[in-house]
């Protein structure tokens, strides 16, 4: 097979395998006199198909031999169709499309898509497994599904550490079993000589195989068939291969002594067996256990020849006759998998090699083996992808929508004419979505290019995907290569990470603001009609795959989806929590930092209202902060007050109370807990002390951020009962969650004197690790220490400038100071720095305090005033960094969703501090 071209020499952003000149058409292929050439053409095409199926799909390009060939009239050829049917028994049309372009036939190959509903989904496609088993008297080359089943059995047996043994059977002359043939064969094996035409008293079975060769080339024939039978016996229950016995008459003939050198034959057999590929699940990794014995065959006391007996013991793991006939794209060529690679991919074992697909462009990372590996993303992302798609990318509108809106607004404002140009480019499509990004290259893990203004992905009805790359410098020679690679990698991501099951191709197009500019041959990129999004359901499936891809990357779109994803998780968690409302009227809810307890508390108010059908003014929310109270008032119709107001007022109509951020409470104005309980659980004198009613009193607190442990008014931890602890819903980026986990770990290792033993017992590193993995999304966390105030301000200004250029808004950002008195000092430095960097058009830079959290401006306030509130991007500013500052790290980190920047004026943080 010719080495395929997969670089930018090809028009399609795909792996393009060139198989040379091929004869197509049923009649033409029937007339071929060179049967060897016919088989070679067939084999080259089928190998290329297998390799592309296993490597994310692509295109096979064949030069048509007959100049009068017409695909519509002549078809492919029966032998080619049969080969495709064997490779894809459930329908080749699901994976293959054909298109004639002049004197070339293109075969479009979709990425292999395992049937996830199957108990044993096949992760890759194979021509033959070359893993054999005995089936009575036959050696069967197992189908891929049967091979997978065998591998699973071997894997489980190795994990159990027990080998299946067959107990000895009591002798009974009236019973005959297959095991008897094995015993009789073992008796033959013990002999030293046999007689010519002696008839053996047993036949072939699961454990016995007879072979007789009349050809002159005995040794080559033995070496040809030996791997099949050794693999079959080793993978079943062991057995005997007896060479020199007729399988029909069971007579001993042997191999004539003139044709065989017994010592050489024995050596050849041993060498052949020792070279067989094996795969081990066990730690011992033994070799194939076999014994070769040569028996003399005599004819009237004269040496006639030899019988060769190969005894094969059952193998602990898997023995292959040869490497599986399965192919992938590696180093720009269709390459056969080794047995080890094949097993790892079949079983989807994470340690599988990741370099099976390489790209000729060193600076552009290749799709690698992820094209045929299972998607690696949080399970909940897959569960919520439909809801997220409908929230951000609804397909019901009969227009072309530009998303994300904030980025598009910024982009079109800065670059006049771009919006009209994109509308022209997307004409005549009337229904679809164009997803803009500052760099789709960066979003899929490639290097960003400064000469690219933006990328835009068109997902439209009745169209394949189109990736528009808007160039700043149209003379840049690398533009076409850039667009080609981004399209290829984005397609791979949609399949491997997003799990898109349909046929997908992305057409790259280069444009500039002055008008359309297409690279050479750009207009020649055509995909079959089946690659178009035919229905709204197809669009939704593709957009849901894009949602998953985006959530697993770092971008504005990822952050917008991530915030909504965390909101869905919180709503789900509240559904579970609210199931306790009916039977648990009083409850202490201990929440880890990052679990968004205020959001849980707000949703609990709604659940109380719906469950008990009460008026909003009968439900009271109590918190410590005025700013948090104002925020909650905008979120719910229920009454919301601070603890101070609660202690000073009377609330005769209140039936249910939810108390939030009680870790900040103190008993300065009285016993708030007793007052709350007297409202929700009042007693009537003279009525036998019976409860008038049992209202809800739910108390939310973060036990790691208790400020006044001695005077906070809470019952002592042992008396906080009934109690629920929420540790498995850390709703922020993985990098931020790790900071919180590290801080909590250090707190428990060196606890302050006012921390209760109960709080220490709450933190279990294993449980926290599970919480991180369950909902982990990528984010950003950076730490800088030993900075001046000016350096801190410059860092914040530069970061904000970069973020705003990518479409983030001032309302996404909170700059939090450790102390309230630091706000004024930082504000002046920040304003100067932002004027220098022209952040958000410097004249518009406005800082708001926590009270303006629902406004459009950057928040600049103390972390304490921001209690209970969150923003996507948080800068934590502190005058110093001490190793005892875990409390403030938790405060900063628990306010951030996707971006956290910790900046310290003094004190160098050790390298391992945040690990």
From Swiss-Prot:
Cofactor needs: Mg(2+); Mn(2+)
Position of the signal peptide: none
Gene3D superfamilies listed in its UniProt record: Schlafen, AAA domain
GO CC annotations, alphabetized: cytoplasm; nucleus
UniProt-annotated stretches for the region Required for ribosome binding: 390-569
Gene Ontology biological process terms, A to Z: cellular response to magnesium ion; cellular response to manganese ion; mRNA catabolic process; platelet maturation; rRNA catabolic process
Keywords on record: Endonuclease, Hydrolase, Nuclease, Nucleus
Residue spans of biased composition, Basic residues class: 157-167
GO terms assigned for molecular function: ribosome binding; RNA endonuclease activity
Domain of life from the UniProt record: Eukaryota
A Pfam family hit: B3R
EC assignment: 3.1.-.-
Textual note on the cofactor: C-terminally truncated SLFN14 endoribonuclease: Requires manganese and magnesium for its endoribonuclease activity.
UniProt protein name: Protein SLFN14
Gene: SLFN14
């Amino acid at each position: 097979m010719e080495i395929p071209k997969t670089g930018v020499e090809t028009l399609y952003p795909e792996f393009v395998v060139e198989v040379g000149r091929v004869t197509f058409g049923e009649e033409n292929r029937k007339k071929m006199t060179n049967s060897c050439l016919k088989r070679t053409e067939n084999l080259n095409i089928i190998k290329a198909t297998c390799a592309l199926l296993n490597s994310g799909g692509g295109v096979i390009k064949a030069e048509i031999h007959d100049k009068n060939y017409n695909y519509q009239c002549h078809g492919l050829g029966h032998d080619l169709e049969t080969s495709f049917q064997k490779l894809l028994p459930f329908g080749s049309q699901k994976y293959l499309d054909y298109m004639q372009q002049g004197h070339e036939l293109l075969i479009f190959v979709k990425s292999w898509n395992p049937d996830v509903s199957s108990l044993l989904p096949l992760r890759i496609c194979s021509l033959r497994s070359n893993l054999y088993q005995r089936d009575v008297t036959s050696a069967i080359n197992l189908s891929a599904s049967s091979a997978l089943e065998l591998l699973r059995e071997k894997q489980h047996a190795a994990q159990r550490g027990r080998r299946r043994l067959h107990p000895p059977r009591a002798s009974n002359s009236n019973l005959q079993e297959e095991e008897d043939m094995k015993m009789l064969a073992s008796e033959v094996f013990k002999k030293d000589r046999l007689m010519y035409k002696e008839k053996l008293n047993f036949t072939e079975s699961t454990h016995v195989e007879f072979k007789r060769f009349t050809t002159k080339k005995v040794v080559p024939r033995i070496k040809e068939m030996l791997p099949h039978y050794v693999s079959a016996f080793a993978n079943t229950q062991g057995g005997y291969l007896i060479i020199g016995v007729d399988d029909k008459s069971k007579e001993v003939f042997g191999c004539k002594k003139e044709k065989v050198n017994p010592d050489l034959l024995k050596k050849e057999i041993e060498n052949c067996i020792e070279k067989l590929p094996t795969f081990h699940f066990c730690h011992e990794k033994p070799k194939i256990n076999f014994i070769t014995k040569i028996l003399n065959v005599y004819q009237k006391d004269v040496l006639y020849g030899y019988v060769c007996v190969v005894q094969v013991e059952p193998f602990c793991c898997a023995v292959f006759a040869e490497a599986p006939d399965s192919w992938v794209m590696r180093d720009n060529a269709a390459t056969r998998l080794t047995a080890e690679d094949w097993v790892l991919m079949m079983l989807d074992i994470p340690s599988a090699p990741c370099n099976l697909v390489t790209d000729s462009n060193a600076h552009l990372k290749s799709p690698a083996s992820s094209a045929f590996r299972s998607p690696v993303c949080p399970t909940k992302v897959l569960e919520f992808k439909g809801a997220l798609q409908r929230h951000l990318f609804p397909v019901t509108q009969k227009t072309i929508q530009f998303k994300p809106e904030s980025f598009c607004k910024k982009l079109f404002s800065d670059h006049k004419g771009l919006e009209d140009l994109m509308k022209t480019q997307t004409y005549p499509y009337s229904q679809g979505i164009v997803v803009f990004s500052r760099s789709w290259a960066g979003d899929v893990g490639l290097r960003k290019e400064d000469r690219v203004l933006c990328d835009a992905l068109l997902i439209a009805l009745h169209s394949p995907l189109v990736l528009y790359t808007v160039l700043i410098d149209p003379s840049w020679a690398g533009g076409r290569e850039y667009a080609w690679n981004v399209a290829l990698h984005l397609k791979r991501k949609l399949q491997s990470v997003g799990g898109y099951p349909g046929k997908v191709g992305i057409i790259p197009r280069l444009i500039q603001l002055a008008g359309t500019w297409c690279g050479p041959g750009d207009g020649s990129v055509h995909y079959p009609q089946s690659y178009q999004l035919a229905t709204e359901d197809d669009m939704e499936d593709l957009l849901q795959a894009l949602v998953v891809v985006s959530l697993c990357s770092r971008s504005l779109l990822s952050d917008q989806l991530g915030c909504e994803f965390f909101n869905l998780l919180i709503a789900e968690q509240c559904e579970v929590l609210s199931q306790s409302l009916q039977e648990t009227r009083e409850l202490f809810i201990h929440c880890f930092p990052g679990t968004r307890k205020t959001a849980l508390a707000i949703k609990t108010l709604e659940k109380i209202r719906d469950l008990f059908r009460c008026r909003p003014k009968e439900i009271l929310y109590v918190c410590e902060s005025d700013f948090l109270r104002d925020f909650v008032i905008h979120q719910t119709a229920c009454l919301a007050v601070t603890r101070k107001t609660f202690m000073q007022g009377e609330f005769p109509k209140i039936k249910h109370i939810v108390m939030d951020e009680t870790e900040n409470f103190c008993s300065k104005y009285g016993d708030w807990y007793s007052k709350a309980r007297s409202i929700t659980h009042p007693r009537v004198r003279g009525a036998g002390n019976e409860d008038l009613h049992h209202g809800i009193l739910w108390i939310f607190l973060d036990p790691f951020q208790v400020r006044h442990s001695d005077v906070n008014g809470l019952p002592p931890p042992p008396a906080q009962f009934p109690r629920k602890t929420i540790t498995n819903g850390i709703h922020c980026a993985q990098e931020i969650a790790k900071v919180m986990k590290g801080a909590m770990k250090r707190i428990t290792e060196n606890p302050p004197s006012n921390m209760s033993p109960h709080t220490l017992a709450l933190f279990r590193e294993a449980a926290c690790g599970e919480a991180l993995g369950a909902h982990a999304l990528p984010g950003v966390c950076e730490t800088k220490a030993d900075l001046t105030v000016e350096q801190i301000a410059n860092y914040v200004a530069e970061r904000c400038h970069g973020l705003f250029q990518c479409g983030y808004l001032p309302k996404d950002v909170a700059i939090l100071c450790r102390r309230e008195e630091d706000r004024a000092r930082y504000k002046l430095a920040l304003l100067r720095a932002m004027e220098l960097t022209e952040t958000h058009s410097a004249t518009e830079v406005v800082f708001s305090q926590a009270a303006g959290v629902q406004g459009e401006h950057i928040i600049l306030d103390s972390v304490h005033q921001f209690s209970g509130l969150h923003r996507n991007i948080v800068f934590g500013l502190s005058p110093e960094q001490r190793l005892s500052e875990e409390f403030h790290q938790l405060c900063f980190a628990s306010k951030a969703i996707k971006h956290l920047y910790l900046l310290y004026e003094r004190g160098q943080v050790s390298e391992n501090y945040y690990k």
